Structures are given as structure tokens and as C-alpha cells.
Amino acid sequence: MESYNEYELISHSKLADCTMFIVDMVYRPMHLHKELELCVVLSGSCRVSTDRHGVEAGPGEVLLFDAGSSHELCASGVPARLLTLQISNSFCARFYPQIRSIRFGCRGLSACLLPERLTALRRAMLLALRAYLRDTPEAPFACMAQVNEIFAILLSDTPYRVLSDTENMTQTRNAERMHRILHYLETHYSEPVRLSEIAEREGLTQTYLSHLFREQLHIPFQDYLARLRLEAAMLLLRQSDTTLTDAAYACGFSDPKYLNRSFQKNLGMSPRQWLQENRPDPSRAPSAEDPRTAQRILTPDECRALLDALEIP
């Protein structure tokens, strides 16, 4: 199956500049976002693809994804349980402005950190989550104290580079532009969409936008749009008794034959063959995070129970 990237939107409603959760993940499509992300594999294992590289992550591994770094996660067998921390680039910018420009050179941190430092990092993540879940006046300070400890470990023990002002400005501008474009595609894929129209909206030439799309997402614009429509059709077919023809038109294909071709190209089978293996199940409601994602975010009570079982104070 060809990979693609989406631009993941992350809100910081619980604590400024910081989001934490535990997720049981089967599959997370290739995506990118403006936040730095750390994931501790609590149980299970997963294959992590970052652009053209892959990492196998088992229990205890800590994964690091830079802001703007595309990545895909696929569990090996049973769902992988991940403790996730997402930090916006505004974190500690007032007292350490370089943080906006730092890019780390390691994805699986077991390859970069000594065992005792990796253990300290995992514990700081768990303590940060414990504080994050508390609704008390001191909780945000306790959480951010652990986040500061995490960054102290990363900056002292893992390789990184500092982007130049020009590189940083270019990455930020491109990230904001891709956010607008991908949000537009996410909300208009069922309609006729042309690269020329989006280029005009962005004040770019069609050639420049086509190049930017390939550079940022490693896939041509039309292939990305077709993949977006295919995944929407797969979701619709899996969760209802919609016919193939109706699903094709509802998801933006101008002719059902293009849906057939997309199935063959990306999955190596016809829609009917795929349906035999994925019979409609209306009970499989889409995730609140992403309707095309096979994952479940644990509730706060479930997270607390897990921390209790791990004897995290």
C-alpha cells in the first residue's frame, strides 16, 4: 500500500503547550504536525515509518518525532498501547527560544540513550501524565516540571541540530501552508478538487505547489487526493451497507471505475474482494480523533487505573 501524509491537528485544551494521553493503536496513517511528539510503548509493539525509514518499537521503547516530521504507526498483531506527549513549539520559548529550531536526530531513543537514562525518561513521562490528569492548582506545575526533566534528558543525551533562521522560517511557512491545504482537502474531497484552484487560493503557481506537495508529503497531489477518497470510501463501506456505486460518488470519485482502480492500485484487490474480508459493521464507529484511524484513546479513569497498576505515585 502506498503511504501518504496528513496534517494532524492537535489542541492544547488541558494544559497550555502540552497534550498527553494513552492510546490503544492498531494503525495511524502517515501524518505530520507542528508539535514535537514522544511516545512510550507500554505494551505490544509497532512498526514506525518515518518518511523512507522504519523502526521496530517494542515494549519500553520511547519514540521521538520532530515537529513537521511525517510518521506512520502500525501495530504488530495486538494493538500497541502508547503513552503520548505532544508539545507545541511555544514550550519554554521565553527562556529558551532555540527550542523552536531544534531537530533531534533519533527516532527510537533506545539507540541513543543509556538504559538508566531511558528508564528515567519513561518515568518522567509517567509522572507527567499522573500530574496532567490531576485537577488541582499545583498539577500544571508538577506536569511541566516533568516535561522540563524530559527535555533536559533529550538535550543532554541525544543528538540534535539547530535550524538556521532561514530554515526555521521556511519550515514554519510551509507547515502553515500545508495545514491550510490539507484541511481544505479533508473537508472538500467529496467535491471536484483541482490543483490549479488550490494554487490560486494560495497565490502560487501550479508547478510550485505540485513540487511543494511532493517535497512535504512525498506523494503527488492527485495520488494523495485519490488515497483520501479511497479511505473515506473504505470507511463508508465498512460501517454501512452502502453500494459500491453510491460510495464512489459520495467520496468524490467521478466514476465507480476509478474507485475500482484505486482499490487495485493501493490494496491489490477489487472492492468486492476487500468487502469479503471487511464485511459492513455499523457498530464500528469512527474515532473521535480521526475517522480513518484504527485507535482508541483511553479515558482519564482508565489512565489512572493503569498508573495505579504501575505504582506511579
Positions of PLM-derived features:
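Short, Lys/Arg-enriched, Trp-marked, Pro/Gly-tolerant hinge/linker segments that flank
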Residues: 107-117, 132-143, 152-183, 187, ...
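Conserved metal-binding segment of the jelly-roll/cupin
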Residues: 57-70
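A hydrophobic/aromatic-rich effector-binding and dimerization subdomain
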Residues: 1-19, 67-134, 148-164
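Generic protein-terminus/edge-of-domain signal
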Residues: 1-58, 77, 258, 285-313
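Basic/polar phosphate-binding segments, predominantly the helix-turn-helix DNA-binding elements
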Residues: 186, 191-228, 242, 248-277
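Alpha-helical structural segments
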Residues: 180, 227-232, 277, 281
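Regular secondary-structure segments
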Residues: 42, 122-136, 182, 186-189, ...
